[in-house]
Amino acid sequence: YQVLEEGSHYIIKKIIVNSGGKLSLQSHQHRSEHWIIAEGEAVVTINDEIKTLKENETIFIPQGFKHRLANKTATKLIIIEFWYGDILDENDIERFEDIYERI
């Protein structure tokens, strides 16, 4: 990922997910997130709901909700991720499943 901008209560990141890749199933205690699909197609899990999002579509992930992003296509996926909250820390993460074994 690449941090594009930081403020006192927000961070904006660019995230690239390669073909077949996915983020861990995770939640955050201190922040909400908003994802914008900039390029490609994303399979998004929020709690027990699964949606497919295409370019220019967005989704909001409330604080405390389990969520995951996956790229099941043959091309790369690029999202712009907004973090909102009073505590914005990379360690504010609880992982439930992770293909990279970071649990």
Residues covered by each model-derived region:
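Short acidic-glycine-tyrosine-enriched beta hairpin
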Residues: 47-66
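A generic "binding-loop/recognition-motif" signal
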Residues: 21, 30-31, 49, 65-66, ...
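A short glycine-rich, His/Asp/Glu-containing loop-to-beta-strand
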Residues: 1-32
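Metal-cofactor-dependent catalytic cores
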Residues: 2-8, 47, 95-102
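Glycine- and acidic-residue-biased ligand/ion/polar-headgroup-sensing regions
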Residues: 30-48
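Double-stranded beta-helix
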Residues: 68-103
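Short glycine/proline-enriched turns and hinge-like loops at secondary-structure junctions
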Residues: 28-29, 54, 71-74
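A structural signal for the main folded, soluble domain(s) of proteins
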Residues: 4-7, 41, 68
